[in-house]
Amino acid sequence: MINIEIIDFRNFAYGKQKKVDDEIYGGGSGMLLKIEPIDLALENTKGKRILLSPQGKPFTQDDALKLSKEENLTFICGRYEGFDERIRNLIDEEYSIGDYVLTGGELASMVIADSTIRLIPGVIKEESYKNDSFQNNLLDYPQYTRPATYKNMNVPEVLLNGNHKEIKQWREQKAYEKTLKNRPDLIERKNNAK
């Protein structure tokens, strides 16, 4: 169902040393990934080309759902100081997984791949992700399992009473409260979507 292929763009570099990076025009610290090896590596790829970068737009659950409908995806993972700017002319999307910098894009590609793959029909049960955090711009409600009491920490009574209408209302309220506390930006996004 899912096939993952790793393409080392060093295999597409010229010269004995197969150099994929070089100094920055105009000066500056660090090395930039060169355009030629990445362009050559991309020539035989299919589907949407995705650049992973802290400069990209924030990756969301909606993006994962959109990507899950694609037949093929190619993730371009950076290293060093970043990419030659012209590489952005070769891509379809540029995503960031957060406001921080990693040593390379490999971890970001795994995060995006995992969140996307789980939404492909047949990978997990649809019910398993329909109520996930972010599905309705809300975080998930608190969930509990046995035992009902552990070291004086109790499962809320409403979850034990069997009244499905009350349980649903409790879950909606708690999801809203958790989102308001931890991610108020999602509440604002939900309100703006109306």
Swiss-Prot record:
Query: Which terms in the GO cellular component ontology are assigned?
Result: cytosol
Does the record's keyword annotation contain Transmembrane? no
Sorted keywords for this record are:
Cytoplasm, Methyltransferase, S-adenosyl-L-methionine, Transferase, tRNA processing
* Entry's EC annotation: 2.1.1.228
Q: What class of enzyme is it?
A: transferase
Localization per Swiss-Prot or TrEMBL? Cytoplasm
Q: Does the keyword S-adenosyl-L-methionine apply?
A: yes
- GO biological process terms, semicolon-separated: tRNA N1-guanine methylation
GO MF terms listed in the record are: tRNA (guanine(37)-N1)-methyltransferase activity
Summarize where S-adenosyl-L-methionine binds, as residue positions: 78, 97-102
Any Pfam family from its record, for instance, is: tRNA_m1G_MT
The domain of life is Bacteria
Q: State the PANTHER family in the record.
A: TRNA (GUANINE-N(1)-)-METHYLTRANSFERASE
What does this protein's UniProt record list under function?
Answer: Specifically methylates guanosine-37 in various tRNAs.
What is annotated about its quaternary structure and interactions? Homodimer.
Q: Which family does it belong to?
A: Belongs to the RNA methyltransferase TrmD family.
Recorded protein name is: tRNA (guanine-N(1)-)-methyltransferase
Gene name of this polypeptide: trmD
